[in-house]
Swiss-Prot record:
CDD domains: Arna_like_SDR_e (cd05257)
GO molecular function, one term: carboxy-lyase activity
Protein name according to UniProt: UDP-D-apiose/UDP-D-xylose synthase
Binding-site positions, NAD(+): 57-88, 193-197, 243
Active site (UniProt): 193
Length: 398
């Protein structure tokens, strides 16, 4: 075959890492490959590298275009393995055959943390234990996806609201190697997720210290983009409550007011999925710089309150859809009303970017409005007609 007809990834072995070394093709066991992050990472690896991916998940809807069947140019590059890591003996075999395991599997929807705390703890800690064990025992590298929730509350949140130190960065900017992890009381089961994620981080770190496990831990700060979460009643349960962007998207698609929990005063940062995937790509191909590291991956420039996010999404969706906003586009609801008993929250989550910038030279690029336009355009094209049909059927049967 001539080079002109080769797929883009065919020459990937000639690429160099950040230290000028050739990048050898890897075999990657990607657990949770069928989800939001996994689907984008699979696309990136198939388009730009020669790596081979064992895509492990219980569903493949978001990567069906890659695996069912694989396009001719990806033959032998990606394979789907339908298994549940809770109880499938095939998992160890896949990890043994791989050079690198990436674990994306998790329950990571805030509405589940205090309504399904046992499932949340089991999914994020107990079910992750065999993955760590198999990697450690077989001397395989692990990239484990954690969460920015492990930081919990900021130090500044314990100061009076008018205290001048609340505005000082050292009281709210979150640093991987310095910031304490501060959670609420046990009765606030919202912290079940953060505690489980922190404990598996500590176990991975201990495996590295005592048994030489090569690992990288990723702490995502609100990664946003197409294929995130689900729209209730369309490609997810009708009673399901996805994360904030999908919740607001669902409201906009149905022309319902956006629900602001406790007034929407919490502050968050948001990063575009394609920017974040570039950071993960750098971790994969620069093990000497990534091993033993914990990386914040977010965009501190895209900080807004949840209320401001709702306002921006309302404006952007009106432009995308051509539909004017509602006269009353937002309503306030209490956290108890929206999430149930046991909910608690962190006031602010701003990532420090020093370590990832120093080790990998990575910085996010996409402004918040641009990523919202891309995401809401996708949501509108993907879901609007299905929601119209659903609403019309509900109206006819009532």
């Amino acid at each position: 075959m001539s080079s002109s007809s080769s797929p883009p990834a065919a020459s990937a072995a000639a690429r160099l890492d950040l230290d000028g070394n050739p990048i050898a093709p890897l075999t990657i066991c990607m657990i949770g490959a069928g989800g939001f992050i996994g689907s984008h990472l699979c696309e990136k690896l198939m388009a730009e590298t020669a790596h081979v991916v064992y895509a492990v998940d219980v569903y493949c809807d978001k990567i069906r275009h890659l695996v069912d069947p694989a396009p001719p140019h990806l033959h032998g590059r990606i394979s789907f393995h339908r298994l549940n890591i809770k109880n499938d003996s095939r998992l160890e075999g896949l990890i043994k055959m791989a050079d690198l395991t990436i674990n994306l599997a998790a329950i990571c929807t805030p509405a589940d943390y205090n309504t399904r705390p046992l499932d949340t703890i089991y999914s994020n800690f107990i079910d992750a234990l065999p993955v760590v064990k198999y990697c450690s025992e077989n001397n395989k590298r692990l990239i484990h996806f954690s969460t920015c929730e492990v930081y919990g509350k900021t130090i500044g949140s314990f100061l009076p609201t008018d205290h001048p130190l609340r505005k000082e960065p050292e009281f709210y900017v979150l640093k991987e190697d310095e910031s304490p992890c501060i959670f609420g009381p046990i009765v606030k089961q919202r912290w079940s997720y953060a505690c489980a994620k922190q404990l598996i981080e500590r176990l991975i770190f201990a495996e590295g210290a005592e048994n030489g496990l090569e690992f990288t831990i990723v702490r995502p700060f609100n990664w946003i983009g197409p294929r995130m979460d689900f729209i209730p009643g369309v490609d997810g349960p009708s009673e399901g409550v996805p994360r904030v962007l999908a919740c607001f998207s669902n409201n906009l698609l149905r022309r319902e007011p956006l629900k602001l929990v406790d007034g929407g005063q919490s502050q968050r940062t948001f990063v575009y999925i394609k920017d974040a995937i570039e950071a993960v790509h750098l971790m994969i191909e620069n093990p000497a710089r990534a091993n033993g590291q914990i990386f914040n991956v977010g965009n501190p420039n895209n900080e807004v309150t949840v209320r401001q996010l709702a306002e921006m999404m309302t404006e952007v969706y009106a432009n995308v859809s051509g539909e004017p906003p509602l006269d009353e586009p937002m309503i306030d609801v209490s956290s108890k009303q929206f999430y149930g008993e046991g909910y608690d929250d962190s006031d602010k989550r701003i990532p420090d970017m020093t370590i990832i910038n120093k080790q990998l030279g990575w910085n996010p690029k996409t402004p918040l409005k641009d990523l919202l336009e891309t995401t809401l355009t996708y949501q509108h094209k993907t879901y609007k007609e299905a929601i119209k049909r659903q609403m019309s059927q509900a109206s006819a049967s009532s």
